[in-house]
């Protein structure tokens, strides 16, 4: 990739949880989610299963759907980009840090446009180690960083107090709003993550359709093949429910 003619690496970051849609005044769905702690692929399946095995949590999580209209708008933007743009598709947002360092070359600054339910500039957790919730801070320490966060009203309201890096930055609610304000933005690299610890498994079908379209569009693409498979949570939910039923029976017998 050419790096000598410019000083800034333009990055388009797409976290699939950006497309989560639910009533922004309904706290039930998020309260029923896992805590978002970084997990390996597969481990997060068990975590989700533990929530979905509970009738109340399962009902609340089911309220979350995919914003298909916004997903299509993002796809239209991707269709306008060069087919040779490097693309990485993976499970966790933490991998964007390494992807950027691989492509930064001699450039000394980074501009990240992050489509995300979360701003990912959190300081808590991880014992200071890189994770899916603090990678923005790592980039801010290592490079001159220009950061734009594109998020829905649900994401904006759920974030609470905003981090310093967003001070003075415009707010964008959609890719269309961002494009209108930044018509010349062209990404040098594109990062996509499924965010297994945040996106409910029932949204996998739309992600797979989107990811396979991306794979068919771009030539320089790589990633974790596990995120190109639908998560099979049902068997774990059944196991947990059966274990809970067994424990309840044993407790009932011992209490007599």
Question: Where are the language model's segments positioned?
Answer:
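Conserved alpha-helical scaffold segments that buttress catalytic/binding sites
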Residues: 2-256
């Amino acid at each position: 990739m050419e790096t000598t003619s410019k000083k800034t690496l333009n990055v388009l970051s797409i976290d699939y949880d950006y497309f989560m849609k639910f009533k922004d005044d309904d706290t039930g769905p998020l309260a029923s989610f896992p805590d978002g702690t970084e997990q390996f692929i597969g481990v997060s399946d068990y975590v989700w299963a533990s929530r979905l095995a509970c009738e109340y949590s399962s009902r609340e999580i089911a309220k979350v759907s995919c914003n298909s209209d916004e997903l299509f708008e993002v796809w239209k933007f991707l269709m306008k980009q060069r087919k040779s743009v490097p693309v990485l598709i993976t499970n966790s947002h933490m991998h964007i840090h390494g992807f950027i360092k691989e492509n930064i070359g001699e450039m000394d600054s980074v501009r990240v446009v992050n489509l995300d339910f979360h701003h990912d500039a959190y300081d808590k957790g991880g014992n200071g180690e890189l994770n899916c919730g603090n990678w923005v801070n790592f980039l801010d320490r290592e490079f001159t960083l220009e950061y734009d966060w594109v998020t829905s009203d649900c994401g904006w309201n759920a974030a609470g107090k905003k981090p310093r890096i967003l001070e003075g930055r415009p707010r964008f609610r959609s890719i269309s709003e961002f494009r209108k304000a930044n018509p010349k933005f062209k990404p040098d690299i594109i990062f996509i993550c499924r965010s297994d610890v945040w996106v409910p498994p029932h949204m996998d079908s739309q992600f797979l359709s989107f990811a396979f379209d991306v794979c068919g569009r771009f030539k320089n693409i790589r990633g974790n093949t596990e995120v190109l498979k639908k998560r099979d949570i049902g068997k774990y939910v059944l196991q947990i429910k059966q274990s809970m039923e067994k424990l309840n029976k044993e407790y009932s017998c011992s209490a007599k």
